Regions:
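ATP/adenylate-binding site constellation spanning eukaryotic-like Ser/Thr protein kinases
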Residues: 7, 35, 66
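Short hydrophobic/aromatic patches at helix-to-coil boundaries
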Residues: 1-3, 71-75
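Thiol-based oxidoreductase modules, predominantly thioredoxin-like and allied folds used
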Residues: 27-38
Length: 75
């Protein structure tokens, strides 16, 4: 399962979500700007407040680290 913790105004979040869509991956988009519980979950998982944070089956990737994301997805 893939979760993307993001905000509507984050350009890297948009880039990340477009990348996942282009590669054919479905994901849960979690807007942490209006969901305090999700924001706390994101900080607990990643140790940081910044977005995007990607959770790929429990592997946490902070930011749009394209090579690390591709590796985690088996691309």
């Amino acid at each position: 399962m893939i979760k993307v913790y993001s905000t509507p105004t984050c350009p890297y979040c948009v880039t990340l979500k477009n990348f996942l869509k282009e590669k054919g991956f479905e994901f849960e988009d979690i807007d942490v700007s209006n969901n305090q519980q999700a924001a706390e979950e994101m900080v607990q998982k990643s140790g940081q407040m910044g977005v995007p944070v990607l959770d790929i089956d429990g592997e946490i990737i902070a930011g749009f680290d394209k090579e690390r994301i591709k590796q985690a997805l088996g691309l």
